[in-house]
Amino acid sequence: MHRQMRRIKQQLSHEAAVQVMREATSGVLALEGDDGYPYAVPISHVWTDECLGGEDEFIGRIYFHSACEGYKIDSIMDSEKASFAVVVRDEIVPDEYTTYFKSAIATGRVHVLEDDEERLRGLRALAEKYNPGQQESAEKEISGALSRVAVIAFEVEELTGKQARELASREAKASRVE
């Protein structure tokens, strides 16, 4: 599955790529859709450091929530392979004919959670990210919606991050100064 990044100097460290995933408020989940065509859907998410040991090891987990039926759920049920891309910076620089960007892409396996404890863990993580410090109202919302919402777990097997070479150059200069 892994391919070497062509522009290696623009590659983010694993820790920086995780930070990009944490900071992003939305991304695009890519699945295999009907007739083998890609299906990509914008969606809110939360990155967690949960992982398994042993042969099923993965490097992080991303949670999403969704309606219980629809194209996204059908696609997940048909194929567990997926990717998820986020962009936290996308600054157009007209004078340089470029953009200053910072992004990350996760590749792994996705599934709809059945266990209520796992579903609650995912919904609580989403609530804390998007409504920090509102635990009481979040619990009320979650308990009222639990039977009507699907919670999706994306087990990240590979994570890569990339940034514009201009940003990489700035960061390299800054670290030499320190």
What is each model feature region?
Residues C51, R61, K81, R109, ...:
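Structural motif
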Residues M21, S75-I76, L126, F154:
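A generic structural signal for nonpolar/aromatic side chains embedded in well-ordered alpha-helices
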Residues H2-R7, R89-E178:
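Charged, gly/pro-rich active-site loop segments
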Residues M1-V28:
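Short, basic/aromatic recognition patches
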Residues A24-C68, F84:
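Short beta-strand segments
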Residues S26, A40-P42, K81-S83, F101, ...:
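Broad gene-expression machinery/nucleic-acid interaction feature
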Residues F64-S66, Y71-T99:
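Helix-adjacent hinge/juxtasegments
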Residues R22-A24, S79, L146-V149:
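Short gly/pro-enriched beta-turn/loop segments at secondary-structure junctions
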